[in-house]
Amino acid sequence: MSKRPTIAITCGEPAGIGPEISIRAAWELRADVKSILIGDAAFLAMIAGAINPDIHLSALSWQAVRNSGLPAFPRDQITVIDCPLAAHVVPGRLDAQNGRYVLQTLDIAIDGAMQHWFDAIVTAPLQKSTINDAGVPFTGHTEYLADKTATKQVVMMLATNATLQPLRVALATTHLALKDVAAAITFDSLAGIIDILHADLQQKFGIAKPRILVTGLNPHAGEGGYLGREEIDVITPVLQAAQAKGYDVRGPYPADTLFQQKLLAGADCVLAMYHDQGLPVLKYASFGLGVNITLGLPIIRTSVDHGTALDLAAAGLGQADHGSMLEAIRVAAQMAAASKASAE
């Protein structure tokens, strides 16, 4: 990359593997990306020194950034925006006292991205229970980002480059009980999701005419109505309306036969109706190398495809694989470049 993008990385749950994988990935990609870690500077410096004494961190306060903007970024160091912990961290052991700290790091990242100081944000995994135990109702990164950016509808998409061709799988519904999925798939909701997918694949991925393949909800895509009418009553009318706008959107396909090379060739994204319909295929092919992307936001956000791995954190440094974090940063940088190009 001729000009390094500025990527803010929230280090997530401090007792998990987030701080370690964030430091490792930021250091490995320092030649191509200006990574800004957001977290407790002393805590991160301690981890960095244990990983590699040659890793140099430079700390600054968020107030200094707000007053004077971001300083220059030497390639031989990582910048940290200091956000002090509330309590001492024991690897692998959750502490609700640090729940609000995790949200503070997110708030800094969101604020900086909205102010255009950061080209994108990448989030390390957090522990929802710790934040809720701190007295803050919290359902997840995606919902929090949507609320903080006043975004009405967002789309969760996972992507990987570990397959024969890049595979992107978006979801019409996310963390819902299976019994609630059918009722959540309405004409307006599905149409809005396809609008977001089409727009962001163009603007944030640089795909001029994206092709989107859509699964049915029911086995065999409803078998002509014998196994459910959602395909007839909702999904097909939505696809016809999208096609009338000029979108290259196809389906509904039976989900059990969609993920084959002859159908995926030339496709830019698959839209699945629910979480465990679309993600097992992607995670089987690329677990540890996948990237979670939130579409529909006014900012770019990617994340890893795994959790806090408290057991690995408790076992000590060097146990965790930072491959997904590397990919999340790379994808964020690529999306930032595509977004700038589309805006020119």
From Swiss-Prot:
Its cofactor is Zn(2+); Mg(2+); Co(2+). Substrate binds at H141, T142, K283, N292, R301. InterPro entries: PdxA, PdxA_fam. Binds 1 divalent metal cation per subunit. Can use ions such as Zn(2+), Mg(2+) or Co(2+). GO terms for molecular function: 4-hydroxythreonine-4-phosphate dehydrogenase activity; cobalt ion binding; magnesium ion binding; NAD binding; zinc ion binding. Pfam families: PdxA. It catalyses: 4-(phosphooxy)-L-threonine + NAD(+) = 3-amino-2-oxopropyl phosphate + CO2 + NADH. One of its GO terms (biological process) is pyridoxine biosynthetic process. The active site is located at the dimer interface. This is 4-hydroxythreonine-4-phosphate dehydrogenase. The gene is pdxA.
